[in-house]
Design a protein with these regions (language model features):
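Bacterial N-terminal signal peptides
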Residues: 5-15
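Extracellular/lumenal carbohydrate-interaction signature centered on repeated Trp-anchored short motifs
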Residues: 93
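Extended beta-strand-rich segments in extracellular/periplasmic secretory proteins, especially
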Residues: 130-132
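N-terminal targeting sequences that direct proteins away from the cytosol to non-cytosolic compartments
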Residues: 2, 15-81, 88-90, 99-113, ...
Length: 181
């Protein structure tokens, strides 16, 4: 009735395993999120930027975040602005990016067609960019979005209204200097 082969397997299983002399070894490995991401490490995470530009002399290179391929700062310490270049999948949508900027400034919602009417086409060397400007009572976003191959290249200026007013022409000139390589 009782099968001998099952009995042997069960008996064998009771005899196998760790013996008392086997020590348990613990390993600790740092989580990847604990890694400090420097500007150079972050740049390596992005595709190469397909264009060149002329950076205004008053801009200083800033620290990257996980979204920007390169960053600069401009303005005083009391009213700094941040300029970033980021590459996103074209599937993310041009209109969605522009509407998102309005949301970041907590501006009233508008129909997408109405928002897009405020966007200006700018002819660049090798591409056409979309220029837009938004501001609330204290803060401004100036931006250029350049569709190129399968990406949207986002060039964004965000800072206080006073700094934005002073730096607008330099930022616009920077955007217009973009040259596709």
């Amino acid at each position: 009735m009782f099968r001998f082969d099952i009995f042997c397997v069960l008996l064998l299983l009771t005899q196998v395993g760790c013996n008392k002399s086997s020590g348990i070894v613990e390993y600790e490995v740092d989580r990847e999120s604990d890694k400090v991401l420097t500007t150079d490490l972050l740049r390596e995470q992005f595709d190469p930027i397909p264009f060149r530009w002329k950076v205004p002399a008053e801009w200083t290179e800033g620290e990257n975040d996980q979204f920007s391929a390169i960053a600069w700062t401009v303005g005083s310490k009391s009213d700094p602005a941040r300029i970033t270049v980021s590459g996103l999948s074209a599937a993310s949508g041009l209109e969605a990016q522009i509407v998102r900027w309005r949301g970041q400034l907590q501006l009233p919602e508008m129909a997408v067609t109405e928002v897009m009417n405020s966007v200006e086409d700018v002819t660049l060397q090798g591409a056409t960019g979309k220029w837009c400007e938004f501001k609330n009572d204290t803060e401004s976003i100036l931006g250029m979005i350049v569709p190129h191959t399968d990406k949207l290249w986002i060039i964004k200026f965000r800072g206080g209204n006073a700094t934005a007013a002073k730096a607008r022409d330099a930022f616009r000139g920077f955007c217009e200097s973009l040259k596709i390589e």
